[in-house]
Amino acid sequence: MKNKTALKGGTYSIVLTTIVLAILVVVNIFAQALPSSVTQYDISSTKLYSITSNTKVVVNALEEDVTIYWVVQNGKEDDVIEKLLDKYDTLSDHIKIKKKNPDIYPTFTKKYTSDEVANNSLIVECGDRNRYIAYSDIYVTSGSAYSGYSGTTSFDGEGAITSAIDYVVNSEQPKMYILNGHGEAELSTTFSNQLTKENIETEEFSLLTTNEVPDDADFVLINAPSSDISEEEKNMLENYFDNGGKLLVMAGPVESGDLPNLYSLLSDYGVKSDNGVVVDTDHDHYAFQAPYVLMPTIESSDITDPLLDESYYAIVPIARGLEIGNTDKDVNVTSLLTTSDEAYSKAAGYNLTTYDKEDGDTDGPFALGVDITQDENDGQMIWYASSYLVDDTYNSYSSGANLDLVMNSISSLVGQRDAVSIRSKSLQYNYLTISDSTSSILKLVMIGVFPIVYLAVGIAIVVKRRRANEAN
């Protein structure tokens, strides 16, 4: 009787063990069938393997099929790019990923580009529109002219792919006209590259040779003029704004003279500009021991909230002070960037010899950026009181926040409030890297050794109980 009871107990344990193992096998098979977005969690500090909400806005709006061709030889696949493409594949039924091995299809890329195509390059296509994404546009390399060293510093796969998708599905892209004829600065390399990435077409124009802003302008950029516009040009720009036009202005102090006609665009709408260089003596509001390199308070708005959410700081060097007052015009004026109460404007401008307050200097606080909107006709003017906001050096000092601020401003102007800039992701950290042999050992331990050990322990317990029962 005791032996029969022990046998039943042992049989029960074996059956239970078998059932548990069967459940584990089924769960494992089910888990492998799930998409990577469900089974994998991105714990990297820069969310290297994650898709941002900006991409989801673009992808979820797709109504046409988009094909992403992954040009790569067998065995040369980049793991990060592969995981990123898996994310896009699971994000929408309108996106298809197709791998093209150049050894098998040696002429495939010729119809898209004349460049020599490296492994892990991509081609995004929708209908008769396409864009080629070079591997060097995905892994961004930077270097130092002083050290001669260059290396891969950031991963821009998501930004490049999402930009390409947006480009191929939209035949009409925003167009920015750049005012010239007043010694305006050239666009910085970083700014120009970002405009291309954001699919914004650019064209220069002069109001000296035409009597109005071109009809196909989505907005006009006035970038760091060194001399003033004429009264006639000012009237044309004001008429453009009053009739629903969009303006983005980055204009700070000039080394000699003033820009009264240009800044009268602001004063007509209740914003006064002081002709000087703002210094801020509050240590929390300037950088690099230079009180004219300002770190203003970022005020909450649709344009600035993405920076606030990520705790970024804008750096605004050599700026004029703006003061928001009253106006009889039907406009709303929103301050985007502000100094501390300890700021003042140095009347000496570029010729200042001291940061101390002197006679003739104007007390702050000041706004350094404003957003002026019209309720009646959707006119909008965003104005930053520094000519160096997207200068490559100062943008680098801000960790890219300055460029993000300007690109968010452009998104606001062209009505793409959700499609703000997608930042590249830094690679300046240590990876957790394991070899293939270590990976194989871990798989063997998890899939083979652990279940066998579990089964062996169960058998040992059954045998021990049986012997104990026999002894009794």
Where in this protein do the model-derived segments appear?
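Short, surface-exposed patches at the edges or C-terminal ends of soluble domains, predominantly
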Residues: 2-472
